[in-house]
Amino acid sequence: MSNTQTKNVPELRFPGFEGEWEEKKLGNLTTKIGSGKTPKGGSENYTNKGIPFLRSQNIRNGKLNLNDLVYISKDIDDEMKNSRTYYGDVLLNITGASIGRTAINSIVETHANLNQHVCIIRLKKEYYYNFFGQYLLSRKGKRKIFLAQSGGSREGLNFKEIANLKIFTPTIFEEQQKIGQFFSKLDQQIELEEQKLELLQQQKKCYIQKIFSQELRFKDEEGNYYKGWNKKQLKDVLEFSNKRTINENEYPVLTSSRQGLILQSDYYKDRKTFA
Protein backbone atom coordinates (compact mmCIF):
# COMPACT_ATOMS: atom_id res chain seq x y z
CA MET A 1 0.00 0.00 0.00
CA SER A 2 1.20 3.52 -0.65
CA ASN A 3 0.33 7.06 0.36
CA THR A 4 -1.25 9.53 -2.00
CA GLN A 5 -2.62 13.04 -1.87
CA THR A 6 -4.99 12.64 -4.83
CA LYS A 7 -8.62 13.54 -4.17
CA ASN A 8 -10.98 10.60 -3.46
CA VAL A 9 -8.09 8.15 -3.23
CA PRO A 10 -7.39 6.23 0.02
CA GLU A 11 -4.26 7.07 1.98
CA LEU A 12 -3.35 3.37 2.07
CA ARG A 13 -3.72 1.38 -1.12
CA PHE A 14 -2.60 -1.96 -2.51
CA PRO A 15 -0.02 -1.62 -5.29
CA GLY A 16 -1.18 -1.96 -8.88
CA PHE A 17 -4.33 0.11 -8.52
CA GLU A 18 -4.77 3.69 -9.70
CA GLY A 19 -7.51 6.24 -10.23
CA GLU A 20 -9.99 7.88 -7.92
CA TRP A 21 -12.75 6.12 -6.06
CA GLU A 22 -16.30 7.14 -6.93
CA GLU A 23 -19.13 8.07 -4.60
CA LYS A 24 -22.26 6.07 -5.40
CA LYS A 25 -25.61 5.47 -3.80
CA LEU A 26 -25.94 1.98 -2.40
CA GLY A 27 -29.24 1.52 -4.20
CA ASN A 28 -27.48 1.85 -7.56
CA LEU A 29 -25.10 -0.99 -6.68
CA THR A 30 -27.67 -3.57 -5.64
CA THR A 31 -30.25 -5.93 -7.10
CA LYS A 32 -32.20 -6.16 -3.85
CA ILE A 33 -32.75 -4.16 -0.68
CA GLY A 34 -35.48 -5.67 1.47
CA SER A 35 -36.29 -7.45 4.71
CA GLY A 36 -38.23 -10.50 5.78
CA LYS A 37 -41.12 -11.10 8.13
CA THR A 38 -42.06 -13.22 11.10
CA PRO A 39 -44.06 -16.35 10.15
CA LYS A 40 -47.72 -16.44 11.14
CA GLY A 41 -47.82 -17.89 14.63
CA GLY A 42 -44.40 -16.49 15.48
CA SER A 43 -42.03 -18.69 17.46
CA GLU A 44 -44.51 -21.59 17.40
CA ASN A 45 -43.27 -22.25 13.86
CA TYR A 46 -39.61 -22.52 14.86
CA THR A 47 -38.14 -26.00 14.53
CA ASN A 48 -34.83 -27.72 15.29
CA LYS A 49 -34.14 -28.47 11.63
CA GLY A 50 -35.16 -27.24 8.21
CA ILE A 51 -34.41 -23.85 6.66
CA PRO A 52 -32.20 -21.54 8.79
CA PHE A 53 -34.19 -18.52 10.00
CA LEU A 54 -32.04 -15.51 10.84
CA ARG A 55 -33.04 -12.93 13.45
CA SER A 56 -31.38 -9.74 14.66
CA GLN A 57 -29.50 -11.61 17.42
CA ASN A 58 -27.79 -13.69 14.74
CA ILE A 59 -26.28 -10.58 13.15
CA ARG A 60 -22.98 -9.71 14.80
CA ASN A 61 -20.08 -7.47 13.89
CA GLY A 62 -19.14 -8.83 10.49
CA LYS A 63 -20.27 -12.42 10.92
CA LEU A 64 -23.27 -14.58 11.73
CA ASN A 65 -23.72 -15.87 15.26
CA LEU A 66 -25.34 -19.28 14.81
CA ASN A 67 -25.42 -20.27 18.50
CA ASP A 68 -29.07 -19.23 18.81
CA LEU A 69 -30.15 -20.23 15.31
CA VAL A 70 -33.71 -21.45 14.73
CA TYR A 71 -35.27 -23.09 11.68
CA ILE A 72 -38.54 -23.02 9.78
CA SER A 73 -40.19 -25.67 7.64
CA LYS A 74 -39.85 -25.79 3.85
CA ASP A 75 -43.55 -24.95 3.48
CA ILE A 76 -43.21 -21.74 5.50
CA ASP A 77 -40.03 -20.89 3.64
CA ASP A 78 -41.90 -21.27 0.34
CA GLU A 79 -44.52 -18.81 1.60
CA MET A 80 -41.72 -16.35 2.45
CA LYS A 81 -39.55 -16.86 -0.65
CA ASN A 82 -39.18 -13.09 -1.17
CA SER A 83 -37.15 -12.85 2.03
CA ARG A 84 -34.71 -15.63 1.24
CA THR A 85 -31.07 -14.74 1.70
CA TYR A 86 -28.13 -16.38 -0.04
CA TYR A 87 -24.41 -16.70 0.45
CA GLY A 88 -22.69 -13.31 0.08
CA ASP A 89 -25.68 -11.15 0.96
CA VAL A 90 -24.87 -8.23 3.25
CA LEU A 91 -27.25 -8.36 6.22
CA LEU A 92 -28.05 -5.25 8.24
CA ASN A 93 -30.13 -4.85 11.41
CA ILE A 94 -32.60 -2.04 10.80
CA THR A 95 -34.61 -1.75 14.04
CA GLY A 96 -34.12 -1.55 17.79
CA ALA A 97 -31.01 -1.30 19.92
CA SER A 98 -28.94 -3.47 17.56
CA ILE A 99 -29.53 -1.20 14.55
CA GLY A 100 -26.49 -0.98 12.29
CA ARG A 101 -25.05 -4.38 13.17
CA THR A 102 -23.83 -5.97 9.96
CA ALA A 103 -22.86 -9.47 8.84
CA ILE A 104 -22.12 -11.35 5.65
CA ASN A 105 -24.31 -14.38 4.99
CA SER A 106 -21.77 -17.20 5.22
CA ILE A 107 -24.22 -20.13 5.08
CA VAL A 108 -22.96 -22.11 2.08
CA GLU A 109 -24.98 -25.33 2.03
CA THR A 110 -28.42 -23.75 1.61
CA HIS A 111 -30.29 -20.48 1.50
CA ALA A 112 -31.73 -18.99 4.69
CA ASN A 113 -34.71 -16.84 5.53
CA LEU A 114 -35.00 -13.90 7.91
CA ASN A 115 -37.39 -11.73 9.87
CA GLN A 116 -38.44 -8.11 9.46
CA HIS A 117 -35.69 -6.73 11.69
CA VAL A 118 -32.94 -7.67 9.22
CA CYS A 119 -32.37 -6.13 5.79
CA ILE A 120 -30.92 -7.97 2.79
CA ILE A 121 -28.46 -5.95 0.70
CA ARG A 122 -27.64 -7.96 -2.43
CA LEU A 123 -24.90 -6.47 -4.60
CA LYS A 124 -24.74 -6.62 -8.37
CA LYS A 125 -22.18 -9.06 -9.74
CA GLU A 126 -19.71 -6.30 -10.59
CA TYR A 127 -19.44 -5.30 -6.92
CA TYR A 128 -17.69 -7.40 -4.30
CA TYR A 129 -20.00 -8.07 -1.35
CA ASN A 130 -17.41 -8.10 1.44
CA PHE A 131 -15.98 -4.70 0.50
CA PHE A 132 -19.37 -3.14 1.17
CA GLY A 133 -19.96 -5.25 4.27
CA GLN A 134 -16.66 -4.03 5.68
CA TYR A 135 -17.51 -0.44 4.73
CA LEU A 136 -20.74 -0.59 6.74
CA LEU A 137 -18.74 -1.96 9.67
CA SER A 138 -16.28 0.94 9.54
CA ARG A 139 -16.57 4.06 11.66
CA LYS A 140 -17.58 6.08 8.61
CA GLY A 141 -20.19 3.51 7.60
CA LYS A 142 -21.69 3.32 11.09
CA ARG A 143 -21.90 7.10 11.24
CA LYS A 144 -23.77 7.23 7.93
CA ILE A 145 -26.19 4.59 9.21
CA PHE A 146 -26.73 6.58 12.41
CA LEU A 147 -27.41 9.80 10.53
CA ALA A 148 -29.81 8.04 8.14
CA GLN A 149 -32.08 6.71 10.89
CA SER A 150 -35.69 7.84 10.79
CA GLY A 151 -38.09 8.76 13.56
CA GLY A 152 -37.74 10.73 16.77
CA SER A 153 -36.26 7.77 18.64
CA ARG A 154 -33.68 7.28 15.86
CA GLU A 155 -34.09 3.50 16.05
CA GLY A 156 -35.27 2.60 12.58
CA LEU A 157 -34.01 2.43 9.00
CA ASN A 158 -36.25 2.11 5.96
CA PHE A 159 -35.25 0.79 2.55
CA LYS A 160 -35.18 4.23 0.94
CA GLU A 161 -32.72 5.51 3.54
CA ILE A 162 -30.51 2.47 3.00
CA ALA A 163 -30.62 2.87 -0.78
CA ASN A 164 -29.60 6.53 -0.43
CA LEU A 165 -26.47 5.76 1.60
CA LYS A 166 -23.51 7.19 -0.30
CA ILE A 167 -20.39 5.05 -0.41
CA PHE A 168 -16.96 5.72 -1.91
CA THR A 169 -15.97 2.63 -3.87
CA PRO A 170 -13.14 1.55 -6.18
CA THR A 171 -14.28 1.41 -9.79
CA ILE A 172 -12.31 -1.81 -10.35
CA PHE A 173 -13.83 -5.05 -9.03
CA GLU A 174 -10.39 -6.57 -8.33
CA GLU A 175 -9.52 -3.75 -5.93
CA GLN A 176 -12.79 -4.19 -4.07
CA GLN A 177 -12.06 -7.91 -3.88
CA LYS A 178 -8.50 -7.35 -2.68
CA ILE A 179 -9.68 -5.11 0.15
CA GLY A 180 -12.58 -7.37 1.11
CA GLN A 181 -10.39 -10.48 1.21
CA PHE A 182 -7.75 -8.63 3.23
CA PHE A 183 -10.27 -7.84 5.95
CA SER A 184 -11.70 -11.36 5.77
CA LYS A 185 -8.27 -12.78 6.61
CA LEU A 186 -7.97 -10.37 9.53
CA ASP A 187 -11.42 -11.41 10.76
CA GLN A 188 -10.43 -15.08 10.57
CA GLN A 189 -7.28 -14.38 12.58
CA ILE A 190 -9.26 -12.42 15.16
CA GLU A 191 -11.74 -15.31 15.46
CA LEU A 192 -8.89 -17.76 16.09
CA GLU A 193 -7.41 -15.49 18.77
CA GLU A 194 -10.84 -15.12 20.40
CA GLN A 195 -11.17 -18.91 20.53
CA LYS A 196 -7.73 -19.14 22.17
CA LEU A 197 -8.74 -16.45 24.67
CA GLU A 198 -11.96 -18.29 25.51
CA LEU A 199 -10.02 -21.50 26.17
CA LEU A 200 -7.56 -19.63 28.42
CA GLN A 201 -10.44 -18.06 30.36
CA GLN A 202 -12.03 -21.47 30.87
CA GLN A 203 -8.65 -22.85 31.95
CA LYS A 204 -8.18 -20.01 34.45
CA LYS A 205 -11.68 -20.57 35.88
CA CYS A 206 -10.89 -24.26 36.36
CA TYR A 207 -7.55 -23.50 38.05
CA ILE A 208 -9.15 -20.93 40.38
CA GLN A 209 -11.72 -23.49 41.49
CA LYS A 210 -9.14 -26.21 42.08
CA ILE A 211 -6.50 -24.00 43.74
CA PHE A 212 -8.82 -22.24 46.20
CA SER A 213 -10.46 -25.54 47.14
CA GLN A 214 -6.91 -26.92 47.64
CA GLU A 215 -7.63 -29.72 45.22
CA LEU A 216 -4.57 -28.55 43.31
CA ARG A 217 -1.46 -27.56 45.28
CA PHE A 218 2.03 -26.43 44.35
CA LYS A 219 5.31 -27.95 45.51
CA ASP A 220 8.54 -26.32 46.61
CA GLU A 221 11.94 -26.82 44.97
CA GLU A 222 12.46 -30.06 46.92
CA GLY A 223 9.22 -31.54 45.67
CA ASN A 224 7.30 -31.15 48.92
CA TYR A 225 3.88 -29.56 49.21
CA TYR A 226 3.76 -26.16 50.87
CA LYS A 227 2.28 -26.01 54.36
CA GLY A 228 -1.47 -26.09 54.74
CA TRP A 229 -3.57 -22.96 54.43
CA ASN A 230 -4.73 -21.02 57.49
CA LYS A 231 -8.21 -19.60 57.95
CA LYS A 232 -8.21 -15.92 59.00
CA GLN A 233 -10.67 -13.09 59.30
CA LEU A 234 -10.32 -10.37 56.69
CA LYS A 235 -9.61 -7.69 59.32
CA ASP A 236 -6.50 -9.62 60.39
CA VAL A 237 -4.82 -9.19 57.01
CA LEU A 238 -5.75 -5.54 56.39
CA GLU A 239 -4.04 -2.39 57.61
CA PHE A 240 -6.10 0.40 59.16
CA SER A 241 -5.73 3.88 57.67
CA ASN A 242 -7.19 7.26 58.61
CA LYS A 243 -5.63 9.08 55.66
CA ARG A 244 -7.64 11.55 53.63
CA THR A 245 -7.02 12.52 50.05
CA ILE A 246 -6.88 16.32 50.46
CA ASN A 247 -5.45 19.04 52.62
CA GLU A 248 -7.77 21.33 54.54
CA ASN A 249 -6.96 24.34 52.33
CA GLU A 250 -7.68 22.60 49.00
CA TYR A 251 -10.94 22.14 47.12
CA PRO A 252 -13.45 20.02 49.05
CA VAL A 253 -14.07 16.45 47.93
CA LEU A 254 -17.56 14.96 48.17
CA THR A 255 -18.34 11.32 48.81
CA SER A 256 -21.59 9.37 48.54
CA SER A 257 -23.35 8.06 51.62
CA ARG A 258 -26.80 6.92 52.70
CA GLN A 259 -27.55 10.57 53.41
CA GLY A 260 -26.48 11.61 49.91
CA LEU A 261 -23.37 13.59 48.97
CA ILE A 262 -21.43 14.92 51.96
CA LEU A 263 -17.93 16.23 52.59
CA GLN A 264 -15.34 13.47 52.64
CA SER A 265 -13.76 15.05 55.71
CA ASP A 266 -17.05 14.72 57.63
CA TYR A 267 -17.68 11.18 56.44
CA TYR A 268 -14.30 9.87 57.59
CA LYS A 269 -14.01 12.06 60.68
CA ASP A 270 -14.57 9.25 63.17
CA ARG A 271 -14.22 6.31 60.82
CA LYS A 272 -11.45 3.97 59.82
CA THR A 273 -10.81 2.69 56.33
CA PHE A 274 -8.88 -0.30 55.12
CA ALA A 275 -5.82 0.01 52.88
PLM regions: where:
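Short amphipathic coiled-coil heptad-repeat segments
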Residues: 1-18, 192-228
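A short glycine-rich beta-alpha junction/loop motif
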Residues: 6-10, 111-119, 150-174
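Non-catalytic DNA-recognition/assembly elements of restriction-modification systems
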Residues: 12-37, 164, 220-245
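A short beta-sheet element
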Residues: 39, 49, 55-56, 67-139, ...
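Specificity-determining recognition surfaces
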Residues: 42-45, 52, 137-167, 245
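Short beta-strand/loop turn elements enriched in aromatics
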Residues: 46-64, 240-261
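Extracellular/lumenal glycan-associated surfaces
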Residues: 177-189, 193-194, 230-232, 236
